[in-house]
């Protein structure tokens, strides 16, 4: 199996091979965008992410493990444009307790919380975070990026990522009265993506 970086490099002379990268990562980019801005915006963000990546592939020179964070960084930049859609989705989630929205990222905590009452509180608490804190915690929790990957995606030092995630966790804990996303790692800095259930 080719690494992501090998695919990017080969696509410079054989553009059709870039489709392998799309096949490998498009579902994750779509899910991340849908969780942040809803299904309607997710299609556009996913498509535009891969268009921007394809057009910028000649300039990519990072390590193999940086391709996924590079793609999520592009998606995150595009989502900034869709911030209003994300804000509307989180406000709607807060208003209606999550009914009528996919909000897949909240499903992981359903075992800990009452879906009708706390899902709306979670949406409101996420919306209340500063955008840079919300971006960091959602890249961590919903895009499953490491702290290094988030630093690559957002273009900030890893220490800044740690601070933003720590602040977001503290604010969420204070607003909600329980820990959200705290049990995802125990060493205050995921070094590898969390294992996916098949």
Residue ranges and their predicted role:
Residues 55-62, 73-97, 107, 115, ...:
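Arg/Lys-rich amphipathic alpha helix in sigma70-family domain 2
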Residues 44-51, 65-77:
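Structural recognition of an alpha-helix C-terminal capping motif at a helix-to-coil junction
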Residues 12-20, 30-48, 62:
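Short, charged helix-capping/linker segments at alpha-helix termini
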Residues 25, 164-167, 171:
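Residues within the DNA-recognition helix of helix-turn-helix
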Residues 2, 98-127, 195-196:
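Acidic, proline/glycine-rich intrinsically disordered inter-domain spacer in sigma factors
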Residues 22-40, 55-56, 126, 178:
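Amphipathic, Lys/Arg- and hydrophobic-enriched alpha-helical face
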Residues 91, 95-98, 152-153, 170-198:
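C-terminal edge and immediately downstream basic/flexible tail or linker adjoining helix-turn-helix-like DNA-binding
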